[in-house]
């Protein structure tokens, strides 16, 4: 599961020139014999430590991390606790329902039981648990939310995996838990919106004004609109809820896949023979996306540690946090 629903509608062609480690960043030494689960946990912990050293209230929500919460021969209890400590929230897609060619089917009872057991760990530690199911009919949407509410989760539903529009409730009002409180941590959010593809909006201003008009406690969006990152003024505008109170604005950041439309991608990499060794297999479901050996020092330097690194750009723009996607990439390397 991942969130590669990204826009190419205005994305300019960026050819990265390489990112160099600054004196303010000290990623761990690259693993010689990596244990995939532990390396993803370590990456999340390092990103958290780095971000919070720059901005102590910075929030991180991980997507697809449920499997990393299970103690196994490869994932120790210490690593599980490290992950729980590193992240402020955990999101899981298709938690209660599966999308089967547009038809909603209940999640397998055994899988649901497993997911609930895994989410009990961060929930007990006071971390936010979010769910995202892809549903279209009102009756199933209501049931999905009731299931989440009964477990203390915060649930969002979307009509499609494109995540390209604001739900009708966000436009017309009436979202669950709508409030005018100041939200400073993800665990305080009573609702959230994830919108990663702004291609349906007529312009940058239309996109920003539409988001600003929604009443959500937290919104997850892309760092970029077209070929330019959002500015600190853009983010500050989005941090105010129209009904009063402050909300959280989180930026999307993939930690398990690279994409050929991101600014770090170099032109030479379009030829598979020239790709660095840390770029692994292509994601056939999302053309232009590639699983990465995320323990690589080169990939880590792309993610954080210099002025042009991805997380540093997010921090500079004033985002309240980052949404770490493709945390289940460890499964590729088992």
Regions found by a protein language model. Give the residues of each.
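Bacterial N-terminal signal peptides that target proteins for export
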Residues: 2-11
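Glycan-processing catalytic domains of CAZymes
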Residues: 14, 26-334
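C-terminal motif of bacterial Sec signal peptides marking the signal peptidase cleavage site
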Residues: 21-24
